[in-house]
Amino acid sequence: MGGKVSLREKFFGCIAGAHIGSAMGAVVEGWTYDKIEEKYGTLDKLLPYEHYNNGWIREPGTTEDGIERQKLMITAIIEKGDRVNAEDVRQAWLKYIKPESAGMVSEPFEAVLLAMAKTGIPARDLGRYCDYSGLNSFARSCHPIGLINAGDMEGAKEDILEVGQLYQTTNSRGLQWAVVTGVAIAAATRPNATVDSVLGAIFDYCHADMVVKELDRELKRTAHCKDFRELRKAFDSVYNGYGMPYSMSYANEVVTKAVCIFRMLDGNTRDAMIAAVNLGRDTDCIAAIA
């Protein structure tokens, strides 16, 4: 990081990195790193893939459900021309989500949330009806909220906890981890931002017990790692859950891995995407954040 990078370039790099990382990681989403290694060695390119067993073979570079969420937030921000709240993004859902999206570019629980969004339920209450309050569904897609609050970490935190209520319960674990994404992006847009300044902002603005304690533990535990092969082995003893819905997609795991990659690779977007894609488990979401 650092150097003479314009704010426009930072915006572009953030969104491009999330899109490309998601598209590359979607190919091997849910795989073990041993399976990735056996088939690709190091996966470092865009390939076709299928999701949801629906017969749609997506062309290389096609994004997935997380980026669809992000696009809706971007659209709401563009249409308002300012920071957005949960109601603003709900209106974007109602205007732009197509009925055929369910099972194609969105998770099953999102169809339920959309149906409720069409009622009189306040936008801030919708997330109460999602069964998966710790998921990374918002943490991996909330980049635009950090960007519209460029340089303002407090504003980013406030808006993450506001808009995120569309997906998860107020102040819940998933939203507290999404604050990491928003605050980090807001901090990274500052002039002369560095990896250390971004990490410092995360530690200053994120929940001390629910978030910072785990991040600090894993940053220290993986400090010796020099590449993604060392990093993924280091995570094995901590993040290894199977046998339950979305077992690989909880926000604490995905965000922590992304932050450790960011630190290890000194904020290099391309290298971070490749590392995340080859880490195994929820590869597309890790790549979107890293």
Language model features by range: what are they?
Residues 1-290:
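Structured, active/binding-site neighborhoods that engage oxygen-rich ligands
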